[in-house]
Amino acid sequence: DMLVDTKNLKIFLLSNSLYPKSKISFEKFEIQNTNFLLRLKEYNILRNYFHNSKSKPFYIKKSKVFVIDENDETLIISPIDKINFTTSKQDDFKKLNIKGNLFDLNFKSLWKKKYVSQKNSQIEIDFNEPNILIKNQLNYNNNSNFNGLTSINFLNQKIEIDYNVKNNQITLKSDNNNNIQIDTKIELSPFNLN
């Protein structure tokens, strides 16, 4: 279970939901100065929420995310300046913007997904110092069958890696014009690296 310790929660209700016998409906909510405890086993629940949710926007400010393992040991503490989750049928995207810090590195992240795609998504993670930009395009079928393209910009170098996960095998391949060339297959069951 995800645990939340908050000191400041604001819920913005639609005015027509205040009348008697009406369903309460909110427009958005904001949370500030909150500690979120996220267990690793809850990752898929959170992922499915963002992919499948038709929820209203939410905003989180000046909070911390604690990632906890199955033994209740803290693996990661990430201070968050802000998180914005918005859904808009007008521009046909769900978007999750995060500005925070991970392992003493400031970052900005944008995840977005079209309403019409089932599980396909894009993510950009931009670290300030050192200046690293990571972009990923994911085409998702199911947990054992997905592929995508990851692009990493670092020190004026760009590396693009195509990846494919299918039938317990991971294939990684980079273009020949990259300074770093990758062409490998990893068998997951039994584990074997080629």
What annotation goes with each model-predicted range?
Residues D1, L96-G100, Q122-D126, L149-I152, ...:
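Short beta-strand segments that buttress and anchor functional surface loops
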Residues D1-N71, I76-P79, T86-N101, K108-L110, ...:
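Flexible beta-edge/linker motif
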Residues Q118-K119, P130-N194:
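Strand-loop-strand
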